[in-house]
């Protein structure tokens, strides 16, 4: 069981690192907490915050479904922060350093910190429509390739998590993780659970010692704690072995264990379904319209550099609505999928009043700022568009 879990952890951690540093992907759009952060702006404006995408909603739904089925198994098997934190503790344990076990009441008190923390994060995120705490986020520091929007404090927080993980088992996951605060109400009603056969149990307490979330497994008949990761460490630690004194499965399955393969299959199914849905139903994360839609329209599908976030998408719409010699008359609708690389943009326009060439000029030509009395260069470059015949790798080539 434990070996299978470590293989899954290694697989998802490798996938995350390779996706970010090898394939230069935008891992932020696959963060389930991003779906929580983006919800208010998407409902009220139809747009998403920063470089988040509709895929954040799909993966959030997938994680919620797996939480209702398996409790917080996402945290125990898939989350890179949880995996790194747990492996750090396992590494120092092999050196003979035992983790500090806090008194139960103190541990439970500290675990309440994540609820006001998530409330503060969501309040300011919803109020400003920006990821105001992104620069302090240890997970973003890991998956961002250390971009310019990472602050010194992100490394301080990350260092604190690393240092804490050497002393206490998974401290961030237990006490501070905002996603854990979101998942806990769903995990409370999780279908599967750990069950202890009270009649056969010898009360050795090894199951509780093995639990990374400090759940007193040896004192309950069924583990209903929302913080359970379904990691099955308690099941593995039971000296009774396969007799089923400590078992995992649906309610009432005392003395019988479900195969761990079922748990992993549910995790992979929920994840694969969420990823497939994001590609089958690729809704834009930014949409804005000017004017009334005519009877006939044309569409330009472009790949644009420096269209990395919601703010850049608003700036792109500003260029499309310019009122100088490159003005585009009539109807305009911009749908965008912001991305740190070459982002996709779909621009719908009135073909009787302009054409695709005019759209491209409006996006890339300098803009005269009448109030400032100066020309402003466009920050955007369109992949494959080189009006001056100058070959610039970044401006004309999709990375």
Regions of interest found by a model, annotated:
Residues 1-210, 217-218, 236-306, 310-398:
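Non-ligating segments of multi-cofactor redox enzymes
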Residues 219-228:
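Short linker/helix segments within small regulatory modules
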């Amino acid at each position: 069981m434990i070996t299978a879990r470590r293989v899954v952890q290694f697989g998802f951690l490798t996938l995350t690192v390779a996706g970010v540093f090898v394939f230069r992907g935008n891992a932020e759009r696959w963060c389930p907490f991003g779906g929580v952060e983006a919800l208010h702006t998407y409902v009220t404006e139809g747009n998403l915050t920063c470089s988040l995408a509709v895929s954040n909603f799909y993966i959030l739904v997938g994680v919620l479904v797996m939480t209702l089925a398996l409790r917080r198994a996402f945290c125990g098997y898939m989350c890179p922060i949880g995996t790194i934190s747990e492996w750090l503790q396992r590494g120092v344990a092999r050196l003979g350093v035992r983790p500090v076990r806090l008194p139960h009441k103190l541990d439970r008190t500290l675990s309440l910190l994540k609820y006001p923390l998530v409330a503060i994060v969501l309040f300011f995120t919803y109020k400003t429509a920006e990821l105001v705490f992104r620069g302090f986020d240890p997970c973003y520091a890991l998956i961002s390739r250390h971009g310019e929007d990472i602050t010194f404090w992100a490394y301080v927080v990350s260092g604190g998590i690393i240092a804490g993980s050497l002393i206490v088992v998974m401290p961030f996951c237990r006490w501070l993780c905002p996603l854990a605060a979101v998942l806990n109400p769903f995990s409370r009603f999780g279908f599967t659970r750990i069950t202890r056969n009270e009649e056969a149990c010898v009360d050795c307490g090894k199951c509780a010692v093995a639990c990374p979330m400090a759940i007193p497994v040896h004192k309950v008949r069924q583990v209903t704690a929302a913080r359970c990761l379904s990691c099955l460490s308690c099941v593995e630690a039971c000296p009774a072995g396969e007799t089923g004194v400590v078992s995992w499965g649906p309610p009432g399955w005392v003395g019988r264990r479900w195969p761990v393969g079922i748990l992993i299959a549910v995790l992979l199914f929920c994840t694969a379904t969420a990823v497939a849905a994001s590609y089958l139903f690729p809704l834009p994360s930014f949409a804005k319209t000017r004017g009334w839609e005519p009877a006939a329209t044309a569409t330009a599908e472009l790949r644009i550099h420096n269209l990395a976030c919601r703010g850049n998408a608003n700036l792109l719409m500003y260029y499309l609505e310019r009122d100088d010699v490159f003005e585009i008359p009539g109807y305009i609708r911009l749908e965008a999928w912001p991305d740190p690389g070459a982002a996709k943009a779909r621009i719908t326009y009135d073909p009787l009043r302009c054409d695709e060439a005019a759209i491209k000029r409006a996006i890339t030509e300098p803009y005269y700022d009448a109030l400032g009395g100066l020309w402003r260069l466009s920050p955007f470059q369109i992949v494959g568009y080189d009006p001056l015949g100058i070959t610039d790798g970044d401006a004309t080539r999709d990375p």
